[in-house]
Amino acid sequence: MNAPERIDPAARCANALRFLAADAVELARSGHPGAPMGMAEMAEVVWRRHLRHNPANPAWPDRDRFVLSNGHASMLQYALLHLTGYDLPMSQLRQFRQLHAVTPGHPEVDVTPGVETTTGPLGQGLANAVGMALAEKLLAATFNRPGFDIVDHHTYVFLGDGCLMEGLSHEACSLAGTLGLGKLICLYDDNGISIDGEVAGWFADDTPKRFAAYGWHVIADVDGHDAHALDAALHEAKAERDRPTLICCRTVIGKGAPAKAGGHDVHGAPLGAPEIAAMRTALGWEAEPFTVPADVADAWDARAQGAAREAEWEARFVSYCAAHPELAEEFVRRANGRLPEGFDAELMALLDAPSPLQGKIATRKASQLCLEALTPALPELLGGSADLTGSNLTNVKASVWVNHAGHGNYVSYGVREFGMAAVMNGIALHGGLIPYGGTFMTFSDYSRNAIRMAALMRLRVVHVLTHDSIGLGEDGPTHQPVEHAASLRLIPNNQVWRPCDGAETAYAWLAALQRENGPTCLVLSRQALMPFERDAAQRADIARGGYVLRDVPAPRVVLIATGSEVEIAARAALDLADAGIAARVVSMPCVELFYAQDAAYRDSVLPPGLPRISVEAGATWYWRGVVGEQGLALGIDSFGESAPAEALYQHFGLTPAHVAAAARVLLEDA
């Protein structure tokens, strides 16, 4: 056994991480000890020697960001947060992976103090970090002035082989290199092991050359267990201002475990009591489980240093306030996520007076008109598109493409839908900006897991999804969404708006921007749609997600529709009126929001006992819960076809005549 006093202090700090991780996984009988043990030296060097943070204030705006992209190594992060002084007591490390503990199996933002993003789906943390670094660069260009670098921090990422195998890593890292995100520093845990074994059989990439081709600064072949080599690499990385840096760290998974280090068995299972005991002997670690020696605890404690660093920044910010009061006020507003007073005034003016927004218009074009009105009042809006700007209509006259220097308010993400969605999550997590990005709705499948993560993290992110149905016509079934609206509605805490005209589109944008606790998907048409007149009460009720658009005395049936099919339902109601059948028309642009209303309001719109028919150019099964067993869901339960839109609507029975006929049959059978 090595005597503790003879072991290098930095090595003892790293070993504290190893044992906290191994002991917590052992107690939980669940978890991943190998990666935390293998990255212990990397973590010691980054967190004790480079990371600028204040454990007493995890929300300090100019803190460095740390992202554990290989989120299965969560016990490494929890050990770091506990040791450096965050509000994470040892009792919570003992509760690792237990119900309601703040130490869940994978890191979750807003659950554990100091965790910057929720990670676990490999590669997404890396893409989030790209978004954070992009946000830092854009905000620095906006707010910094000579002598006042109030936005000046790095984003550090730990990532593994799995992150780099995910295609998302290509999308995000290619973009990061193109945009020159010089304050993004990634440390690659190159241990050569994944769940199935040695990765050489399925991951033989030359990673340094790959990242050099992206335009990254690459520091290759660093011993991931040599603190001096790691420290030198990090100093070199921080000196690079124009390119992101990848530090390739050769590591041994499960480092320190006498019998299991270097093998895939240590990846995702407890080491076992005998192996941990042998490790204690081999590393000269005499402390009991969940006990940290005083000298190690003192060496890790970052509270005093963190407070001093934030105090220095605060003093600089006070001077900044005096020199640039308007900029300082704007910085505080945006950092706190507050929308400016009256930001919606110009948009509301478009609804109060004759304007193109009130005419026959595609809702994608209506969305662009909304953005034209909103962008001057909301400098925090950061737009973008996955190479479909001219189709999504996500740009406005005030759009300036983001460039290498960090100026602009519009990102050309390229054909990178998943990358765009995950990068936008990182932008939202950073704060100070509200990202929105566009693609065709059928390609939302590429983005889906990042949309899910935004919902889980409760992020204000807006997805502009155009060409929302068979209404796009001749491009055919590869581009015609069918199941997508229903699928997106199934994501908890995700709001899906499918507006029927300019007014509903405006309210959809307002709802998306005012929603601070989750993402919004705006599902928009390619084709022009008929506008509807509304009184003040109806217009206000748009914000409730569903409302009575056209009513009649003593209705016998309720027609419920969204988007382009609202016009079909309204015309069907007229046909039914000619046949002596009174039909109420309900527009339901946001089903989730409607069902969040109180029961009295819902019943006033959809009276119990009245037969219901839903009309939406998409999968019908979602609507069966709305119309009930006695109702009828009209839509499309197959893939589309290549043809003009008018022919497709006729082919699939989505016409006023078909809807009216279905209503008559339903009433006859009732």
Swiss-Prot record:
It comes from Cupriavidus necator (strain ATCC 17699 / DSM 428 / KCTC 22496 / NCIMB 10442 / H16 / Stanier 337). GO terms for cellular component: cytosol. Homodimer. This is Transketolase, plasmid. Mg(2+) binds at D161, N191, I193. Pfam families: Transket_pyr, Transketolase_C_1, Transketolase_N. The record marks H32, H267 as: Important for catalytic activity. The active site is at E417 (proton donor). GO terms for molecular function: metal ion binding; transketolase activity.
